[in-house]
Regions:
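C-terminal peripheral helix-coil segments that are non-catalytic and often amphipathic
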Residues: 49-52, 56, 88-108, 122-165
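A ubiquitous short alpha-helical element
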Residues: 11-13, 33, 48-51, 78-85, ...
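Alpha-helical structural elements of signaling/regulatory helical domains
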Residues: 8, 34-38, 56-60, 74, ...
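Short, basic, alpha-helical segments at the C-terminal edge of helix-turn-helix-like DNA-binding modules
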Residues: 18-23
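Amphipathic alpha-helical segments used for helix-helix packing
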Residues: 56-78, 130-138
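Helix-turn-helix
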Residues: 1-11, 15
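Amphipathic alpha-helical packing segments from all-alpha helical-bundle domains
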Residues: 25-29, 41, 73-103, 114, ...
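Hydrophobic alpha-helical connector segments
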Residues: 15, 30-62, 90-91, 112-119, ...
Length: 165
């Protein structure tokens, strides 16, 4: 049945990847592009939005890491290009504001690239290493929702601290 709709496993991968990237991109851009909101509020909303996206798609980070590490260069480029475009949009929008806030002494010196890497690293880690973490910190499934909420808010706190002077 899948073969009928998609033709190849590669086409199925590409369709799923693009759909998920669009969802994540929309959520991130919606948060980061709200120019009427203060910078920190947009960063916090973007961080929470990204975390919520990952919580709704917990297998996606591991899947992408596996696919990228096992992929040929053509697949790598097809995965990398839309992600690169999304990051360039976010960086292009935020970097001038970050530079201005750093110049005014309102936030600690940082580039958008470093800020995004910090945010993504904090959010993605649990979803990549959850099977190693859960036995020590998450006793049963009902605790998982509370644990994820705590992790999300801790990630926000860490980024807030990182930007504080």
């Amino acid at each position: 049945m899948l073969h009928y709709y998609y033709g190849t496993k590669e086409r199925l991968f590409h369709e799923v990847f693009e759909a998920k990237l669009q969802l994540m991109g929309h959520a991130l851009l919606q948060a980061f592009m709200k120019s009427h909101l203060p910078f920190m509020q947009r960063i916090e909303e973007g961080l929470r939005s990204h975390f919520d996206f990952l919580a709704a798609n917990p297998g996606l980070p591991g899947f992408l890491l596996h696919e990228i590490s096992a992929a040929d260069s053509e697949r790598m480029n097809r995965v990398r290009q839309p992600m690169f475009c999304l990051m360039q949009t976010v960086v292009g929008h935020l970097q001038p504001e970050v530079d201005e806030l750093v110049r005014k002494g309102e936030i600690a010196p940082i580039t958008c690239e470093d800020l995004i890497i910090d945010m993504v690293s904090l959010n993605v880690f649990y979803f990549v290493a959850g099977s190693l973490i859960d036995p020590f910190f998450v006793a049963d499934p009902p605790q998982r929702a509370a644990f994820l909420e705590r992790r999300k808010e801790e990630n926000v706190r860490v980024i807030r601290q990182r930007l504080k002077l």
